[in-house]
C-alpha cells in the first residue's frame, strides 16, 4: 500500500500541468524579455496559481510549471489575443 501511494504521488508530480500564463481579459500571453530564469515570470505564476507554481521565460512569454489540473493557461477557448 505504501509503494502504491508513493507511485501515485510521483505520477502526480511528473505529470503536473504546465502552460503559458494568460491574461483572462485579453487572451494574450504575459510577455517577457529575459529568457530562462526570470523573477517577473516566477512572481506572476506564483501570484496567479499559488506558491507551489514555478515560472520562467520561454519564447518571450511566461511559462508556468507545477500547476493544478484545472489551471487556465494559453490559449483560451473562444478568445484570441487581439493583434498578437
From Swiss-Prot:
Modified residues (Serine amide): 82
Compartments it resides in: Secreted
Residue pairs linked by disulfide bridges in the UniProt entry: 28-81, 32-57, 41-62, 45-64
Tissue-by-tissue expression: Expressed by the venom gland.
Gene3D superfamilies: Knottin, scorpion toxin-like
Single GO MF annotation: toxin activity
Listed GO biological process terms: defense response
Signal peptide: 1-16
Pfam families documented for this protein: Toxin_3
Keywords assigned by UniProt, alphabetized: Amidation, Disulfide bond, Ion channel impairing toxin, Neurotoxin, Secreted, Signal, Toxin, Voltage-gated sodium channel impairing toxin
PROSITE patterns for the chain: LCN_CSAB
One cellular component (GO) term of this entry: extracellular region
Location of the LCN-type CS-alpha/beta domain: 17-82
InterPro entries reported in the protein's UniProt record: LCN-type_CS_alpha_beta_dom, Scorpion_toxin-like, Scorpion_toxin-like_sf, Scorpion_toxinL, Scorpion_toxinL/defensin
Other facts: Is neutralized by the single-chain antibody fragment 10FG2.
Family per record: Belongs to the long (4 C-C) scorpion toxin superfamily. Sodium channel inhibitor family. Beta subfamily.
Function according to Swiss-Prot or TrEMBL: Mammal beta-toxins bind voltage-independently at site-4 of sodium channels (Nav) and shift the activation voltage to more negative potentials. This toxin is active against mammals.
Record remark on domains: Has the structural arrangement of an alpha-helix connected to antiparallel beta-sheets by disulfide bonds (CS-alpha/beta).
Name listed for the protein in its UniProt record: Beta-mammal toxin Cn2
Source organism: Centruroides noxius
Amino acid at each position: 500500500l505504501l509503494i502504491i501511494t508513493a507511485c501515485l504521488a510521483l505520477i502526480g508530480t511528473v505529470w503536473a500541468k504546465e502552460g503559458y500564463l494568460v491574461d483572462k481579459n485579453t487572451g494574450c500571453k504575459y510577455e517577457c524579455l529575459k529568457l530562462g530564469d526570470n523573477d517577473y515570470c516566477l512572481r506572476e505564476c506564483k501570484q496567479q496559481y499559488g506558491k507551489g507554481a514555478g515560472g520562467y521565460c520561454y519564447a518571450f512569454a511566461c511559462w508556468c510549471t507545477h500547476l493544478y489540473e484545472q489551471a487556465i493557461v494559453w490559449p483560451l477557448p473562444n478568445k484570441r489575443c487581439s493583434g498578437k
